[in-house]
Amino acid sequence: MELVVKSVSPETLKTATLVVAIGEGRKLGVAAKQLDELSGGAISAVLKRGDLAGKVGQSLLLQSLPNLKAERVLLVGVGKEAELGDRPFRKIISGILTTLKGLGGSDATLALDEIVVKGRDSYGKTRLLAETLVDGGYIFDEFKSQKAEPRALKKITLLTIKAAQAEVERAVTHAQAIANGMSFTRDLGNLPPNICHPTFLGEQAKALGKEFKGLKVEVLDEKKIKELGMGSFYAVGQGSDQPPRLIVMQYNGGKKSEKPYALVGKGITFDTGGISLKPGLGMDEMKYDMGGAASVFGTLRAVLELKLPINLVCILACAENMPSGGATRPGDIVTTLSGQTVEILNTDAEGRLVLCDALTYAERFKPQAVIDIATLTGACIVALGSHTSGLLGNSDELIEQLLSAGKAADDRAWQLPLFDEYQEQLDSPFADIANIGGPKAGTITAACFLSRFAKNFNWAHLDIAGTAWTSGGKDKGATGRPVPLLTQYLLDRAKA
């Protein structure tokens, strides 16, 4: 879908549908007032009849109003001005998009510039609006024999004042890149595990390298992984016929002297739990256990499209966790790339086993900050549900930057503690560390495990187990999170 920004009067635009705001108490917005005057009071007459009160969620379609070039005018309730937050604003925009799709017109124009969203300037409000529109058009029907009919709606014009046009256009550019990144992430996550395996993800990385010149891509096979001494990473994939892959993608958009930022993604393309087998119910959703790697792919795509002036290295630890005669057993001890030994008490705590070696590998790039992203623990879903990602780390400054980015992008995270006392739960009588810490504080002890491999750089861990996908029902599927948060963090660093 194409988004266009214009600073013209709404009554002069020839469009299939013109959308204007009506506040609670039948209060006409600026654009609605202009249209009402031109149409001889047609809008106020409809409102006086009580057809629309202006509450959030209400809408009314008017056909062929006199003296207007628009074929239709859609009145949309926006509630009380002082009470409109991010969530109701998104609901309003989603409702508009649903209505526009149903009308069948090829274009529409939104004259909603006067809407005030709490805590957001023109840029922030437009970002939210544009991301909602573009992401709302997402369809995944690759494996349907009956494809969805092509959408008639091809273009949406956003009206704004001349003074704000540059900021609104910047917001739209950022939003489109982020939405494209989210779409890429969702596509990868929604693919079935018989297609999306570690080798396939390596091929996706190489394809991205061909699409964007200047992106350096290296895919390390299982032989190289073993030679490097990544005993923990290798152990996770050794029970599968699908070999593991370590994917390294480097983008150098900044100065040569600038240290890179590093994103490390967990890429378990299917997680049975291994010998510590998961229950059968809902196991199909374990194809989403590569959501961390998928979100790194999506964030990188957004960065590449925006050509951000930063240096970025992306490291994806990809494997399939399967039971077999050659699979890792509970009680096995492995040696990590860092030299630390790990007693594997539960083979279903495999995400941290691939990430620890990837974090150690990231150290060679001398990064100024490392963020790992993983669908790591069910405990995070218990703690935070499906609305908020868990956030832990060893740098207060980095944590604050990510929290701020999440708030700005409406893709929130919440910090959990990483106190030394939790480290004791990982003690092992046979190795340097155990891979699980008992039933208490599962998200925290998982991050404590990772922290042992992140002592030499600023590090943060995003647990996206509750936010990477939606379970069950018609809305089941990958969400594309936390691409908005990560991209906003990098936009802030690039000051773009």
Curated annotation (Swiss-Prot):
Mn(2+) 1 binds at D271, D348, E350. Keywords: Aminopeptidase, Cytoplasm, Hydrolase, Manganese, Metal-binding, Protease. Transmembrane segments: none annotated. Mn(2+) 2 binds at K266, D271, D289, E350. GO terms for molecular function: manganese ion binding; metalloaminopeptidase activity. The active site is at K278, R352. It catalyses: Release of an N-terminal amino acid, Xaa-|-Yaa-, in which Xaa is preferably Leu, but may be other amino acids including Pro although not Arg or Lys, and Yaa may be Pro. Amino acid amides and methyl esters are also readily hydrolyzed, but rates on arylamides are exceedingly low; Release of an N-terminal amino acid, preferentially leucine, but not glutamic or aspartic acids. Presumably involved in the processing and regular turnover of intracellular proteins. Catalyzes the removal of unsubstituted N-terminal amino acids from various peptides. This is Probable cytosol aminopeptidase. It comes from Pseudomonas fluorescens (strain SBW25).
